[in-house]
Structure formats: C-alpha cells, structure tokens
C-alpha cells in the first residue's frame, strides 16, 4: 500500500488534515492535488495549533517531502506568507522539502476582484465563495489564458500571457463600468514574488514518478469534500475543482493504483449556501456548532450543522472508490441522548436512496432517520477501543452497515495522537 489517496466525503471540514498528518508518519511524500488556499486544514501538535491552507499537512513532519501538484490553483503571495508564518513557529520549509508544480495556474488580485464582483452581482443568489479567487483562476486555466508558474521565468512569455489575460478581464470590467487593470500593475504584483516562488518550481509529475519507482510511500491529500465537487456536488453550490479521488491522478501527474481512504465527521457540517438535507436549525444544530467549535478555518464563518447523512456518504464512497473510512469528531456527540442517521430521502411521494442532481429537488428532500441511543460518556482523548462505550460501538457498526465500507480509524480530539485504530488497513 505505497500510494494512498485521502478525500473528504461530505462538504469539507471532515478533519482530513489531522488524518493526513497522522498517516504521514509512515509515508515519505504528501501531495496536494486540487483546490487552493480556500482549503483549511487544522492540526494540533504538542498543544500548538497549525492552520494550513496551501501547504500539505506533512510539512509539519521533519524529513518528509511536500508537493503541490498542477491541479492546485496557486496564490503565490499566500503560499510565501504561509511558509513564513510556519518558520516563525520553528517549522523549516525550504526548496528541498517543498516542491511546487511548474504547471500550477497562478491566482492574482484580478481573480479576487472578479470573484467578489460576481458574488455581489448575484445578490440573494450568492454561492458563498471564500473570495480567494479560486474559481476565476480555474476559469482562466480552462480558457487557456492563465499565467502558470513556469511563465514567470521568461519575461517575453510573461508579457504575452499578461496581455492575453488582461484582454479578457478588462473587457468584462469595462462592460460592468469597473476600473480596468493596467499591465504594469499585474507585472509589478508578479515581480514582487517571482524570485521567492520560483525557488520551489519543479517538474512535479516527473519527480513523483521517480519517487514511485524508488518505492517511496506517497499520500495524496484532498481538499474540500465530495459534495463540493464541480461535477458530482450540489451544483451550483460547489467549488471549482474536482474533489473526488480520481482527481489525484490529473492534479499530480502520477498515474498509479492507490488505496483510497475517505474521511467523515460523525455528524455533518456545511459552510455557505446550498442544499443540506439533514441540517438542524434547532437546539441540536446549536449544540453541534458549540461543542464542535464549527467555524470555517479559512472563512471564519459559522458552519451549518446536522445529523450524519449515510445516503450522501455512501454515494461519495462509490464516486471515489473508497475502501476505508476514518471517522472524526465522535467526541462531539458525547452529550446526546439520541443520535440520528439519515438512511434515505422522500420527495413528492417518491423515495430516494441517492442524492438527485437537480438543485430544485435537493433543497426539498425530507430525510428519513434511524435512531441510535447516545452514550452519555466523555470519550475525548481516548486511545483504545476497550475504553469506548458500547453504544458508541453500536453507532459505528450502524454507520458501517449503512455506508457499506469498514471504519478503520476514529479520531477522539483534534490532537495528533488521539486516534484509535479499530482494524488494520
């Protein structure tokens, strides 16, 4: 099991960062393959809290190689800022342990401007983006006008790419009576960061293939979750990249068989707008929010909270070919008398065992629940299966039956070491 892909199976914020950090102890390389600094991974090591946005979670482990693949939308200023903030905490990030794909499309201020502009134009129909410029950057990539990291090396090529980029963006800005951007402004923005960011530029696809031939253990670290996937998520309330496991190949350049692990919370959360069948706009939701400290790592927005949705997770398992589940934040459920799991939906007299693609239907689905008795016992920080209450074990067994995949690990706190291995992978 040399290659592992780790993906979220809900709407992100499942705790992937901690799990990647935990598993990377026995890995050599960790690769980010999609998303950008709209992702937020929180890791607690020796009571020190680290919040990562672009950097792979293995950056906190000495001797590991961290790679940012071509599928990532790269904000160069954000990356350098994140590196420098870690150095203040004693974490050494350098061009020997961090490599960035030369093909990464760059996020510039013009992308953030466009995202905010169109969110404002959408009024009450906002997607609820992070305003980090991720979507507009991916638009430019698909439109073949993006500036890539490799373009920064050649002044003539860069000038040409900036002209192409501004022809598009300024046409839109003029049409909306928005101030146009001067070429000198974009060039200055890029030149401020070029020297620092280019020191990390590498042919990542080639390095990964060489590392695989050497027998190195590689973890691919997903961002967001399955139902934020641009194709398979709750469209249009999704992110602008593919978040399912197959994107690990496209977004890194390494084509190989991998063992796929899905990470889920013991309940469900979502940031921003969009359908959420099991959302609890009541005391249950308030309790999950308060106990789980459910604020977005990047946006600092309140996460919407609800019961575990086995229909969604089962669908995500199938979309990503998941073989194993890691269950996080079980300790948040300690105080509940009764815990519910969604096992199906009803809509207009019809039963559904999957999430329909239609946005108009998704927002009207009525969840069908199976109830489980709570365990009413403090499980935070527990590290052995023998110490777990019987009702918690029954809850885990119920989840396994409903989603059709074994749960191998559970997490009982944000701390790195608070993990219980239920089964061998």
UniProtKB/Swiss-Prot annotation:
Keywords: Cytoplasm, GTP-binding, Ligase, Magnesium, Metal-binding, Nucleotide-binding, Purine biosynthesis. Its cofactor is Mg(2+). Its EC number is 6.3.4.4. Binds 1 Mg(2+) ion per subunit. One of its GO terms (molecular function) is magnesium ion binding. It is found in: Cytoplasm. CDD domains: AdSS (cd03108). Pathway: Purine metabolism; AMP biosynthesis via de novo pathway; AMP from IMP: step 1/2. This is Adenylosuccinate synthetase. It comes from Wolbachia pipientis wMel.
